[in-house]
Amino acid sequence: MLPEDRLIQIVERFEYLEARLNAGPAAEEIAAISREYAELKPVVAQIAQWRSVQEDIRQAQAMLADHEMRELAQDELSRLRAGLPALEHALRVALLPRDAADARPAILEIRPGTGGEEAALFAGDLLDMYRRFAESQGWQFQMLELVRSDLGGVREAMARIEGEGVFARLKYESGVHRVQRVPETESGGRIHTSAATVAVLPEAEEVDVDIPAADIRIDTMRASGAGGQHVNTTDSAVRITHLPTGIVVTSSEKSQHQNRANAMAVLRARLYDMERSRADAERAADRKSQVGSGDRSERIRTYNFPQGRMTDHRIGLTLYALDRIMQGEIGEIVEALAAHDQAARLAAQGE
């Protein structure tokens, strides 16, 4: 059975927000009210559809007493009851608790792991993969920091991705990505295994994380390129150290002002993510519903180039379409992970 009391509360809350919007709320309240209203609108539509079908079923049942209408009523009841499970499932999905960060932009961080230069090259391949996927979704992809290796790989990459549902769709990408292939630097044709670490963080606003000025140290320096050479002659690069946690963030684009803003945005995201992770750990029951443990050290995926195979170890998904995947066609993987997480959360609620 669906929780009727909760359905009533949701509809009443939606009607209250609608009345507030029509009355013209204060300027500082408009954004929050509009956001909550937009989130509840599709849920209320699902509730209305479910209630309408329930009413149609009651009317059809009443018609069974009429001998002349009985056959028609039975046909109508069969049709309505056949569609009811799918409708109730959709409503249960709509009622699942939302991750408050799902609608936020995301900060993407990629770093090579074990494997030396080959790991750096693979990190660069992952960066290109996510960039292409973002472009295919119509999202904005902004590089915040990019440090190249000697052979053109990636030592460190940070990007901001903005668009509809960015964090909701990319949050399952955090973890260790392993690659098996013959490196470009390998003359003997032997397959090597290396790895890169991906972190996807929800962007945090200043109101989410309070960072006192006394808690940070800001250093400026010259930006360096591959091999350590200076790419400009001014001290435009910015390094921010968060003293209480030891977190260090660097941004080395051309504008010092922009670098400071970029580095602070990443620092806020990391601190916000730490707080979210801490809260998640305290909700042990909820952790069971997540795809994987959320641990950045967890190996989540293997890319086997000789076999053209990608395997996501968390859900046992294997696709023999590695060329397309590396070109950014990861929608099937993203949707499978989201569906698995959704099913687990529904099961946890006793569906």
Swiss-Prot record:
<dbReference type="InterPro" id="IPR004373">
    <property type="entry name" value="RF-1"/>
</dbReference>
<dbReference type="InterPro" id="IPR050057">
    <property type="entry name" value="Prokaryotic/Mito_RF"/>
</dbReference>
<dbReference type="InterPro" id="IPR005139">
    <property type="entry name" value="PCRF"/>
</dbReference>
<keyword id="KW-0963">Cytoplasm</keyword>
<dbReference type="GO" id="GO:0005737">
    <property type="term" value="C:cytoplasm"/>
</dbReference>
<dbReference type="InterPro" id="IPR000352">
    <property type="entry name" value="Pep_chain_release_fac_I"/>
</dbReference>
<dbReference type="Pfam" id="PF03462">
    <property type="entry name" value="PCRF"/>
</dbReference>
<dbReference type="InterPro" id="IPR045853">
    <property type="entry name" value="Pep_chain_release_fac_I_sf"/>
</dbReference>
<keyword id="KW-0488">Methylation</keyword>
<dbReference type="Pfam" id="PF00472">
    <property type="entry name" value="RF-1"/>
</dbReference>
<dbReference type="GO" id="GO:0016149">
    <property type="term" value="F:translation release factor activity, codon specific"/>
</dbReference>
<comment type="similarity">
    <text>Belongs to the prokaryotic/mitochondrial release factor family.</text>
</comment>
<feature type="region of interest" description="Disordered">
    <location>
        <begin position="279"/>
        <end position="300"/>
    </location>
</feature>
<keyword id="KW-0648">Protein biosynthesis</keyword>
<comment type="function">
    <text>Peptide chain release factor 1 directs the termination of translation in response to the peptide chain termination codons UAG and UAA.</text>
</comment>
<protein>
    <recommendedName>
        <fullName>Peptide chain release factor 1</fullName>
    </recommendedName>
</protein>
<feature type="modified residue" description="N5-methylglutamine">
    <location>
        <position position="229"/>
    </location>
</feature>
